[in-house]
Amino acid sequence: MTVMSGENADEASAAPGHPQDGSYPRQADHDDHECCERVVINISGLRFETQLKTLAQFPNTLLGNPKKRMRYFDPLRNEYFFDRNRPSFDAILYYYQSGGRLRRPVNVPLDMFSEEIKFYELGEEAMEKFREDEGFIKEEERPLPEKEYQRQVWLLFEYPESSGPARVIAIVSVMVILISIVIFCLETLPELKDDKDFTGTIHRIDNTTVIYTSNIFTDPFFIVETLCIIWFSFELVVRFFACPSKTDFFKNIMNFIDIVAIIPYFITLGTEIAEQEGNQKGEQATSLAILRVIRLVRVFRIFKLSRHSKGLQILGQTLKASMRELGLLIFFLFIGVILFSSAVYFAEAEEAESHFSSIPDAFWWAVVSMTTVGYGDMYPVTIGGKIVGSLCAIAGVLTIALPVPVIVSNFNYFYHRETEGEEQAQLLHVSSPNLASDSDLSRRSSSTISKSEYMEIEEDMNNSIAHYRQANIRTGNCTATDQNCVNKSKLLTDV
């Protein structure tokens, strides 16, 4: 190895074998110098050799920045030593050689290779490309409010795992949702059901009919429902004013479900008040039909649990990622229903006791047969109809089985991504900086070696520099174009 300081470069150029006539421009000398410079990298005993210009393509990385890699230099062996994973470095070095292409070796686990990417500081862009190649779905960024109190409120209501009070609020919210769903179901029991078509009781006193009309505001179910709606409204309003973006707030499907969950209550309340004030019996039947439809919307409150349930979130993400496969499944079922309903109709057309009066009437039979449900309310009686029914069931099994592996694969991906430990969580939320400041480097250096050890290494390196410079000058085996220069900001080695 030949090592020399930048301040002695002119002296070395005067030695035998170094041109002095100026026939070679300095720029050309510098280019040849850069071309011939090589560096040895030792990865746990396995030595790699490459050119410095290859590493210099990415100056913000650990190997591409001379200051960053300086603390790993071994002056006695004239190489950089890293006690890291060997198989991973093949891909790391190829990243420099290929100009930015990163491929994980098949024998290196995903989390281990991610740690190597972070150690060599390849940057967030390289990590994102790596995750994309590995099949990771890019997660949406979730910005936080800028104001401190607004951020605290947002974390309190939006992220239950952020603090203890946030968990308490999440538990209260889940309990209120469950109570609301239980009330929605219990009020339909015959023993507790209040007939909305006639909300009153008749008593006869001295040949006089007295009608006592029940008041909805005294109904226990309505009172409990009101308390639940108060909590839902409070939670929605607080999260709206604390959210970082009002536009993104309304784009979130969960917030849309929250709004839909409370609208039926206010519509029902307004309708009841209008009926009591107007007392128009002619419009009562119409309003009751509308109210029944509106009350049905309350069942969507069960989806509010997905805000606090990882399982429901995984299911939703799986369905969202599998929309193409689900669309193909529905399309195949649609084709099968048309084909087999038509076939069974014509196969049973001559049968007097046929259950299939028309092709649309046979749609139901085709659907339940292809999904292998088979209610038995409609069935073929002829031999031809039974053959069609058998083919319909077989085709249904094959049709449903085709997209299932893709959907299961998506579910496994989202499930493992949500349930794996902190190590995988760091992989999915990695944010490695592109640049490291000198203060960070000094802190990391101090944590690696002590000051006395560093001074000893520096002294040995200076002695090595002087030794190799004198040896090369005496032998005259090196020229100015293949000399290695060492100064305060740059360390170059030649092997």
From Swiss-Prot:
It catalyses: K(+)(in) = K(+)(out). Residues 360-371, 372-379 dip into the membrane without crossing it. Glycans are attached at N207. One of its GO terms (cellular component) is axon. A lipid is attached at C243 (S-palmitoyl cysteine). The cytoplasmic N-terminus is important for tetramerization and for interaction with the beta subunits that promote rapid channel closure. The lineage of its organism: Eukaryota, Metazoa, Chordata, Craniata, Vertebrata. A motif (Selectivity filter) lies at residues 372-377. A missense mutation at Ser-309 is the cause of the autosomal dominant myokymia and seizures (ADMS) phenotype. Homozygous and heterozygous rats are born at the expected Mendelian rate. After 6 weeks, heterozygous rats begin to display muscle twitching, startle responses and spontaneous convulsive seizures; over 80% of the animals are dead after 30 weeks. After 16 weeks, they display lower body weight compared to wild-type. The delay or D-type current observed in hippocampus pyramidal neurons is probably mediated by potassium channels containing KCNA2 plus KCNA1 or other family members. It is activated at about -50 mV, i.e. below the action potential threshold, and is characterized by slow inactivation, extremely slow recovery from inactivation, sensitivity to dendrotoxin (DTX) and to 4-aminopyridine (4-AP). Keywords: Cell junction, Cell membrane, Cell projection, Cytoplasmic vesicle, Endoplasmic reticulum, Glycoprotein, Ion channel, Ion transport, Lipoprotein, Membrane, Palmitate, Phosphoprotein, Potassium, Potassium channel, Potassium transport, Synapse, Transmembrane, Transmembrane helix, Transport, Voltage-gated channel. Changing S309T: In ADMS: Dominant negative mutation that abolishes channel activity; leads to myokymia, neuromyotonia, spontaneous epileptic seizures and premature death. The gene is Kcna1. This is Potassium voltage-gated channel subfamily A member 1. Residues 310-323 are annotated as: S4-S5 linker. Gene3D superfamilies: 1.10.287.70, Potassium Channel Kv1.1, Chain A (3.30.710.10), Voltage-gated potassium channels. Chain C (1.20.120.350).
